[in-house]
């Protein structure tokens, strides 16, 4: 049976059950939009139940054809005593693990709803992926990570204890087991897996069965103790144990510093309570998670700023790993660039040995149906980092941690750049930063567009309101027709009124898409403009601003900003870090007719060669 046929069959059963929700005691009653809406509240639960049943039936077909003690295996490993068959027929049972995996991935990439006009219940959607943070690694990528992680194991492979953390459908697990000469021993003694998705975990257990030919009742229990349905991020306490929280005895007692190697694609989910997106129930659930992780006392390095499951997972995996053990992870590139990951990143680099980092641009499809700038890193627990092997497309080179400390002493960023670009960074490292010029003020727009709405009017006043969307290529686009009441000015700080108010300033957008070639674009605003907080501004004397206009619109500053900016915002603290040449060397009256002319002039002041200017040109 092909996967398309299987998906169609699943849709058929979901539709048959869901359509019953539209029936009423009165057969002539109209099916209103309210009836459809109420049915769609329940259809996801129906879809999940039928999906679970079809997976179990496929598993039953596989187990009953391969093992004589099918009843024991189904009862112990898959928690089911009986299967109500739907008539599935699979000619080649060896394809069943793959069919189950593809069916589950399709389910996670789907949204289910009823419509009066169609019997189609499934549509493509990333809602579940976003909600669960579950995006599966392609198998060949998982194999590469396993290979790199095992290259420096602290013990012989046949003795190693290995964990697939947040295993999903076992993409890493199935690439670990072949390392063991005795596959059954690998399944029952060496390799472990943990996840909170029951269907995905069942598929991992099914894959484990695909490596062995027999399994006693006692060995069934052993398998279940190795591939466990638990939340690895939550630890049980002795007073109020929770069934899905991990306990000291789980995973054969290895959960605290017992594993020789851990491989993982951890869940990627920003824990941001948002009732408009997640609903009241979903928002409350996220808030409960946030409260738990911040107060449980188990995490030190991943609880600053907006919480993200992938950062929490990395810290948890380090806890589960032996000193000298190896960690192989695929996760968002923000780990090595974003300020929110600073504390965790410093811990990884300064208290462990980061061996290698491979960067992948957003355009490279490492995941199915998801685009995400990603990195793969290999780490040895303990010690400290020295040389890191960096891979960026075809460019492979070493960067010493001392250089990272020299260039980025505060945050230890490791940008996604080529080896020749590191040479440019070295040249810039000796220059003063924008924040070190006392006569230059770098600020966010003074009018908060949410909190200060009462000061905004459509009636003309001396003060035009400038929003970020009004910032054009060379001038402010007068498109919104909004003004600011004069009564707003006295509400601002004395510093603002002294140094910024009634002055011409350099301004840029506060939001600038991370995928744009040009992220930084500064223009002048009028002296009477009031800036919304969707703008950033720089104020100083007019000659200094004229010089900064040239510098900040050059390719070199645009490049420098981009390499450590990991989101769509232009933050003032990022602008503060920009390297600024000696302003006495800049001709404030310099004029140019092209970006190339500007870059040649500014690039030469920064000491860049022609090839270096070309490398970073907008």
Give residue ranges: language-model regions.
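Class I S-adenosyl-L-methionine
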Residues: 79-148, 529, 557-564, 572
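Signature of N6-adenine DNA methyltransferases within the class I
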Residues: 1-12, 136-143, 167-174, 196-201, ...
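Polybasic, glycine- and aromatic-enriched phosphate-binding surface used to engage nucleic acids
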Residues: 1, 307, 311, 318-321, ...
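Active-site-adjacent bridging/hinge elements
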Residues: 28-40, 100-125, 176-180, 283-294, ...
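Amphipathic alpha-helical coiled-coil/heptad-repeat segments
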Residues: 554, 578, 584-618
